[in-house]
Regions:
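Active-site loop segments of alpha/beta catalytic cores
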Residues: 2-181
Length: 181
């Protein structure tokens, strides 16, 4: 797996070029919006739009490598905060374009970000609240600026200790509740 920010300095993080949101094919977004509108106006279906960008925590694990990202969460909070700021800066541009088009025609939006193992969250609830929650909450609030849809969040693992925080962030539907987690 390509991990472009593994071991990156703060300067390298700041210089990293995220994909250009202007390169998104507007015709594809328009096609999604047209189909959502058609279903919304002609059926009694519950219409879901998959969130157009990956979860912020998982993205960190993918871009840095799992161990490197968790190490940074424990030892380099400045880097982690800057990472999440940069991710949200990019994601907000995509969110605005996508939900401006499809937002009026959906009943819920589905997002995923795995926060836990089978037994417990990847990080302590306190660390989650300090490092992840503010950005996760901001992302959900920003999404809801463009749609009245309910917000479904998927996380594998035992997120039991984070449920109140997820609700506080704006999660209205939690998937899944793992019976053995």
């Amino acid at each position: 797996m390509n991990t472009p920010l593994k071991g990156a300095t703060l300067e390298e993080l700041n210089a990293y070029r995220f994909p250009d949101p202007d390169s998104i094919d507007e015709r594809q977004i328009a096609a999604h919006a047209a189909r959502a509108k058609e279903l919304y106006e002609t059926t009694d279906y519950v219409i879901c739009a998959e969130h157009p960008v990956y979860g912020i925590f998982e993205l960190g694990c993918w871009m840095c490598g799992f161990e490197d990202f968790l190490y940074r969460m424990a030892l380099d909070e400045e880097w982690i905060h800057r990472f999440f700021e940069r991710v949200l800066e990019y994601q907000k541009k995509v969110i605005q374009r996508y939900y401006t088009a499809v937002g009026p025609y959906i009943h819920y939006t589905s997002s995923g970000d795995d926060f836990a193992t089978q037994n417990a969250p990847f990080v302590s609830p306190d660390m989650f609240r300090e490092l992840v929650k503010p950005y996760f909450k901001e992302r959900i609030a920003y999404t809801k600026r463009f749609t009245k849809a309910k917000y479904l969040h998927h996380s594998c693992g035992s997120v039991y200790r984070l449920i109140d925080d997820l609700v506080d962030c704006g999660v209205e539907i939690l998937n899944p509740i793992q019976p053995k987690a």
